[in-house]
A protein has these predicted regions:
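Cysteine-nucleophile amide-bond enzymes
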Residues: 1-179
Length: 179
């Protein structure tokens, strides 16, 4: 068995506050990490820490980029045990998008359509929660997640375990003290 991590965050950016207003959820963004240290953390989001657009596939880092700029980012980090072959399929799904970044776009229309309770999905287009759901389902994991997915929905995954809740910048310190 291996572990993957579902990382829910709220940076406090204007866009994240808008999302929070219409979802009424604690967290406005989700990433998937393939390691406990969150060095292999991926999502769809802003490409530039200073501008919300354009967005796209991002390899996120706790201590640089958007999360470095927004030091008070709140986070809830969950672990999920997966079989070795499921882990490999998740890795391969992420790698496929990472290697072919160009055709993949940020689904900004789909993100805002949630406020209207509409699902708008275009091929090769994701917002953060769609991407994480896609990554999990590519491995064959039964998620039972809704079609109109929000970051908070990942808390309902079967066998998911809360590992940490607090500021994202303090997670690595907490993680290292446990090791």
């Amino acid at each position: 068995m291996k572990k993957i991590y579902i990382v829910l965050t709220h940076t406090g950016t204007v866009l994240s506050r808008i999302i929070k207003v219409y979802t009424k959820d604690e967290f406005s963004h989700v990433s998937i990490a393939l390691d406990k240290d969150l060095k292999q953390m991926y999502s769809f989001g802003r490409l530039n820490p200073y501008m919300p657009f354009p967005g796209g596939f991002v390899h996120e880092y706790v201590n640089s980029g958007t999360f470095e700029r927004f030091k008070k980012t709140r986070a809830a980090i969950y672990s999920l045990n997966v079989k070795e072959e499921e882990y490999e399929k998740i890795y391969n799904a992420i790698k496929k998008i990472q290697d072919a970044k160009e055709p993949y776009k940020f689904n900004i229309i789909g993100l805002f359509a949630i406020a209207l309770k509409l699902r708008i999905h275009k091929e090769h287009s994701f917002y953060c929660a769609e991407f994480v759901k896609y990554s999990l389902e590519s491995s064959g994991i039964e998620t039972n997640l809704p079609v109109m997915i929000r970051p908070e929905n990942f808390k309902s995954l079967k066998n998911i375990k809360l590992e940490y809740k607090g500021t994202l910048k303090n997670y690595r310190k907490t993680c290292q003290s446990v090791l």
